[in-house]
Regions:
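Conserved protein kinase catalytic/activation segment
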Residues: 134-144
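Activation segment
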Residues: 13, 142, 150-152
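Short pocket-lining segment of the protein kinase catalytic domain that shapes the ATP-binding cleft
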Residues: 6-14
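ATP-dependent phospho-/nucleotidyl transfer catalytic cores
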Residues: 15-127, 138
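Active-site activation/catalytic loop segments of kinase-like enzymes and analogous catalytic loops
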Residues: 156-206
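Conserved catalytic-loop position in the HRD/HxD motif
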Residues: 129, 146
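Short beta-strand micro-motifs within the conserved protein kinase catalytic domain, predominantly
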Residues: 1-5
Length: 207
């Protein structure tokens, strides 16, 4: 009987980044590290770095990850824009915003353009689930985990998902930090992480 063995590094004392942000803890160098990771992943898994036969073989290797790609397709590009069974939001506080989003035809058209790119543009290997729950950190280090959503997709997917998740954390901070001054300070730190992540990503990808 064919068997397999997985060897994993024990990441200790690393903590999931989402937990760190919810507790208002800053991570030194986070923007630089994640910008480098996203840029190098995007470049090295693409035709810009790989020989054509290797890229085609790698694309075929990940083409079978249909079930997990379908989860992303539904949760990101489909379900938020109608009353899907799994949707939840704080009611009645967010009812108006949800109704406005679902009635925005122009937005839904743009989302469909992005969905088409997600399903049809195999430009590079993407982590596929790059958010604060897939990053483990210490006060000065970051490691990316959970690669099971990996697939070949558009260049902008990973970096877009990461920045979008940072923005969600930004808007959620008042629920986690009650002191207005401390909350504002942490939100400004999140914005600085976004800025550094993007600038490092662009510089590394283009160098």
């Amino acid at each position: 009987e064919e068997q397999a063995l997985i060897v994993m590094e024990r990441l200790q004392p690393h903590i999931i980044l989402r937990q760190q942000t919810m507790e208002g803890r800053k991570v030194e160098g986070l923007g630089k590290r994640m910008g480098l990771f996203a840029a190098r992943t995007a470049f090295r898994g693409s035709d810009l770095s790989m020989a054509a036969p290797d890229k085609k073989a790698d694309t075929a290797l990940f083409a079978g990850n249909v079930e997990l790609c379908d989860i992303t397709e539904s949760l990101v590009f489909t379900d938020p824009y109608y009353d899907a069974e799994m949707n939840r939001h704080t009611t009645p506080q967010l009812d108006g915003i949800v109704a406005e989003l679902r009635a925005d035809e122009a937005l839904k058209v743009e989302v469909q353009h992005m969905k088409r790119a997600f399903t049809s543009r195999g430009e590079t290997m993407c982590h596929g689930d790059l958010h604060a729950g897939s990053i483990m950190v210490t006060s000065d280090e970051a490691r990316v985990i959970d690669p099971e959503f990996a697939f070949y997709g558009p260049f902008g997917f990973d970096i877009g998902m990461l920045i979008g998740n940072y923005l969600m954390a930004y808007h959620a901070m008042p629920a986690h930090i009650s002191d207005a001054g401390a909350c504002k300070d942490y939100q400004e730190w999140i914005l600085s992480v976004i800025e550094e992540t993007w600038s490092v990503y662009c510089a590394e990808f283009l160098r």
